[in-house]
A protein has these predicted regions:
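Boundary/entry segment of secreted carbohydrate-active catalytic domains
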Residues: 1-20
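Charged helix-capping and loop-helix junction motifs
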Residues: 13, 44-49, 198-201
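Short, well-ordered alpha-helical scaffold segments within catalytic/effector domains
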Residues: 14, 98, 165, 197-198
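Substrate-binding cleft/loops of secretory-pathway carbohydrate-active enzymes
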Residues: 185-213
Length: 213
């Protein structure tokens, strides 16, 4: 929209994007939120999240909030720690995570939004809140074999399973403190990979974390 793009249905009638999705049969939306996306245009800030959620609520669509716990994209190849949390201890970072989660969710609650689902982390097969060497655009730098260099492994599921589970448990409790009825989710990619799910959910379970879905 900010670039002037417009959306049309099959009859050539102009529609707002979320309204068009509703018209096409969608009944739920999933919106990400980053910690400080100011270096990336400000998209997916809590303010941007609210605007999108308000559009969905007005159309009676269910809402999922996707916490990346990063300033930009988080995925299996990179889960870069937010710049403002860099250098913090494990205990400090749990406080950062809880404060960010509660701040965003209270902002939604104060504006009449209640998510049906909340993701604690995005594509967390390797955990979250760990960093890799990245270029100036935030993309991971890979060697000739396609491997990345981990520069901070605090929340890495394989390197530090207890801390990964501790971060997830902190996020779960923070979500429930604001929205006790929301469904708090583990979000993993590759739904066909049973070994991945057994490993990751096993790490969480064996280290005291819990989830709803």
């Amino acid at each position: 929209e900010s670039k002037g793009y417009k959306f049309y249905n099959k009859n050539g009638q102009e529609r707002e994007c979320t309204a068009l999705m509703k018209e096409l049969g969608l009944n739920a939306v999933r919106h990400r939120v980053w910690v400080d996306p100011s270096a990336h245009g400000g998209w997916c800030s809590k303010e941007d999240l609210l605007v999108k959620c308000q559009r969905a609520k007005a159309l009676d669509m269910a809402i999922m909030v996707d916490f990346h716990y990063s300033d930009w994209w988080a995925d299996p190849q990179k889960q870069n720690i937010p710049a403002s949390w860099s250098g913090h201890s494990y205990e400090q970072m749990k406080e950062d995570l809880a404060a960010h989660t509660i701040d965003v969710l209270m902002y939604l609650k104060d504006n009449g939004i209640e998510p049906k689902w909340i993701q604690v982390g995005n594509e967390t097969r390797n955990g979250f809140l760990w960093s890799v060497k990245s270029n100036e655009h935030g993309w991971p730098v890979m060697d000739e074999n396609g491997n990345t260099t981990i520069t901070e492994s605090m929340g890495h599921a394989m390197n530090n399973p207890e801390q990964y589970a501790g971060f997830f448990a902190t996020g779960y409790d923070a979500c429930k403190s604001v929205f006790p009825n929301s469904i708090v989710m583990v979000h993993l990619d590759n739904g066909f990979d049973k070994d991945l799910y057994d490993f990751n959910l096993g790490v969480l379970r064996d280290n005291g974390a819990k989830w709803d879905m």
